[in-house]
Structure formats: structure tokens, C-alpha cells
Amino acid sequence: MTTSSRTCPVPAVNGHMTHYPAAPYPLLFPPVIGGLSLPSLHGLQSHPPTSGCSTPSPATVETQSTSSEELVPSPPSPLPPPRVYKPCFVCQDKSSGYHYGVSACEGCKGFFRRSIQKNMVYTCHRDKNCVINKVTRNRCQYCRLQKCFEVGMSKESVRNDRNKKKKEPTKQESTENYEMTAELDDLTEKIRKAHQETFPSLCQLGKYTTNSSADHRVRLDLGLWDKFSELATKCIIKIVEFAKRLPGFTSLTIADQITLLKAACLDILILRICTRYTPEQDTMTFSDGLTLNRTQMHNAGFGPLTDLVFTFANQLLPLEMDDTETGLLSAICLICGDRQDLEEPMKVDKLQEPLLEALKIYIRKRRPNKPHMFPKILMKITDLRSISAKGAERVITLKMEIPGSMPPLIQEMLENSEGHEPLTPTSNGNTAEHSPSISPSSVDNSSVSQSPMVQ
């Protein structure tokens, strides 16, 4: 029986593919090969003695056997055919093997593992029935995770993986958890500086207040809105500067840099303003020192988002996060391979891994008696994403409330956050998503000085 020489290329199980070529075969594979081909039996069959000949003596048999083995060696067994897996059950991309109970590609395997290990809670911005395939799999994390469960991926398999790793000696694990390597220490220091130099802390600001609509809520105070929109534009530019200073961020494609910035900008804006919350006065302070109470924040444009933001700020207080932790959490929010429409999600994931490790070690060294603080802080990303989704909707309604046009950088960065389609095309017919104005390479000192919102 001969074996077909035509095989399908299978990605290496341990490899990380950043580009997935179009499959050169139909989506449905032939049946999985059930077993290996039998080795050749040539030379192993016994030959009956020739009729009429006497039975040879044992010595003669041994001599003949030895001579035969020397003259006619048995050919080697043929190599088994390469194993061919069915396509990924989740997205139909090329599978790298069976992961967590089903045939899956590296991308869906990693997505499922991260989602379970981090207890991620996703939101679908459509009807919870998104099509998940090789092209659309990064567009809706909620529906992708549901598809993983539907095809049979097992939570327990992920947990068992983690339990295997925990079987290492306790002393070695403890040492690894608390030891900051030189590389991670350098990474942590760079991110701390990037955060502090793009976001002054509350104690560095000269706080000032305004009496404008301070005691009653209105739909929109235009004076406060003008001031808030000016400050928000400057904050967005500072977030872009922060991103450019993160190690590895500028090595990503320009398209991926823009995708990540637009997806995480509102997350980081909310996280930053909430670290400047003063519970005694129930106020928040902006980067120029302007301090607004809850009512004024509502009237400045936050509207129905106000109470969500203040609740989140109160939840941050017991965590007592310092600048290093806030900077690392901001970087993790930004550099996230689960964002929609990334060209190189695996590369983004690789950049995020040392950030997670650095935050874990830093938190455990700073709070050795609070081992659960790392997952508590990390889970704040889920809360931020939930608030940001509502924030993007708020930007859309604000367009109808303000008398003039929305400041371009706010509209471009916040309205088109992940899960929201751009509403208005540019003059050349392209959507704002592809506008070069928010390219990280274009937001430097010269472009800031030329921006009409900062002059």
C-alpha cells in the first residue's frame, strides 16, 4: 500500500505565527489518519525448505542466517506520514494541534488560555451572534470566547495546565516570584518615568476651582465643556507620548500602533483622572490643576458616565496604587493582543508578557503579605473596558448636544473606540480610522504646537 506524497503544512506547535497565509486546501480536511503504516516485512518471512532436501544442522542454519544478514540487509521502515489536523474549530484557520480538548490554531489557543486565566469578562457591542472566522476573530472577544465554549474547549484543561506548573518546588517558585531580573527592572523603571513625565501626580499640581454650575446638574455647561475638551485633547497627546516611550511599541506597524491607541485611549484617560480623586471633597483634578466636583464633572460632558467614573475611583482607593503600578497597568491596557483588527496580535502579546510579569513581581515585593493584590489590580482592566464602552457612546451623544463640532482628536480617538464603527467619512471618502493625524510618529512636539486645540 502506498502513501500519498501530498501533505498539508502544519504550523509548529511551539512556534508563534504572526501572519497566517491563506489555506492552500479546502476548509474540510480528509479524515484524520488513524494509524501509522506497518513496517516492511521484506526479508522477515520464513522460507519453507525445498522438497527433497534434508534438514540442515543448527550450525549450518546459523552460518546461513549470518551470511544472509550481511549480504541482504533489511530495508529501513518507512517514515510515518505527517500528522494532519482538522482546521481550528473556532475560526477555521490552520490548526497547530489539539488544545484544551479541540483542534485549534495558536491564536485561539492563546486567546482562550488568557481569557480563563485572567477571568476576563467581555462585552458584545452587537447582538451576541458575531461571525467568528480567521478574518473576524479579533473583532468581538465576547463571541469568540462563546465560540470556544461551543466547540468544546475546556476550562478545566487550562486550570490543569496551571496546576502542573505549580508542582515545582515551593522555594524555587517563591524566589522566582520575588526576583526582579535586570531586564524587568529596567523595563519597570522606563515605564515609571514615562508615566510620571506625561502625567504629573496630584501633589505636584496647584489646584484651583470654579463656581460654574457647582451645585446643580444641567444637561451641559458649555463653559465647562470648552475647558474640559481642551484639557482632554492635551491628555490624549500625552497618552500618545507615553505610548511611544514604551519599549517595543514603536516596533509595531503604524496601523497596529493606531489600533492599540484608539482602543485603549479612553481606558487610560479614565484610569489617570481617577488616580487624582480626592474622596474628602468628592472631586477630581485635571493636569492644569482644575478641580471639579461630581456635579461639575457631569455638567462638563461626562453626563450619565459620571457616577460610573466616581465609583471606579472609589474602588481604586483601597488598592493604594503608586505611579509605577499605574504606569504598568496603563501599558498593559495599551499593549493587548486581543484588540480588534490587529495585523500582528501575536507580536503584541509577546510585548505584553514582560509587562504582566513586571507588574506581578513589583506588586508582590511591595505588598508581600497581600498575595491576591496582583489579580485584584489586573481585574480593573475589565472595569475600565466596561466604562470605556459607555464612554464611546457618550462621545456620540455629545456631538448632538454641543453647538459646534467635536474637537477632531477627541472624536477620532474616543468615538471610534473598539467595538464602535466610525460614523463620519473624511473628505476623501475614507473613514477617520485611517486618518494620519493620530499616527504616533506624527504626534511630536512640532505637531502638538501646530494643533488648533493646543494653541
From Swiss-Prot:
Pfam families in the record: Hormone_recep, zf-C4
UniProt entry keywords in alphabetical sequence: DNA-binding, Metal-binding, Nucleus, Receptor, Transcription, Transcription regulation, Zinc, Zinc-finger
Annotated region described as Modulating, given as residue ranges: 1-87
DNA-binding region listed in the record: 88-153
UniProt-annotated location(s): Nucleus
Region (Hinge): 154-182
Domain of life: Eukaryota
Chief localisation class: nucleus
GO terms under cellular component: nucleus; perinuclear region of cytoplasm
Low complexity compositional bias, start-end: 435-455
Induction and repression of expression: By retinoic acid.
Residues covered by region (Disordered): 44-78, 416-455
NR C4-type zinc finger locations on the chain: 88-108, 124-148
The NR LBD domain, residue ranges: 183-417
Annotated Polar residues bias: 47-66, 424-434
GO molecular function, one term: nuclear receptor activity
GO biological process, one term: positive regulation of transcription by RNA polymerase II
Claim: Nucleotide-binding is one of the keywords in the record: no
Gene3D superfamilies assigned: Erythroid Transcription Factor GATA-1, subunit A (3.30.50.10), Retinoid X Receptor (1.10.565.10)
TM helices/strands, residue ranges: none
Function statement: Receptor for retinoic acid. Retinoic acid receptors bind as heterodimers to their target response elements in response to their ligands, all-trans or 9-cis retinoic acid, and regulate gene expression in various biological processes. The RAR/RXR heterodimers bind to the retinoic acid response elements (RARE) composed of tandem 5'-AGGTCA-3' sites known as DR1-DR5. Required for limb and craniofacial development.
Domain remark from Swiss-Prot or TrEMBL: Composed of three domains: a modulating N-terminal domain, a DNA-binding domain and a C-terminal ligand-binding domain.
Family: Belongs to the nuclear hormone receptor family. NR1 subfamily.
Quaternary structure, from the entry: Heterodimer; with a RXR molecule. Binds DNA preferentially as a RAR/RXR heterodimer.
Protein name: Retinoic acid receptor beta
Gene: RARB
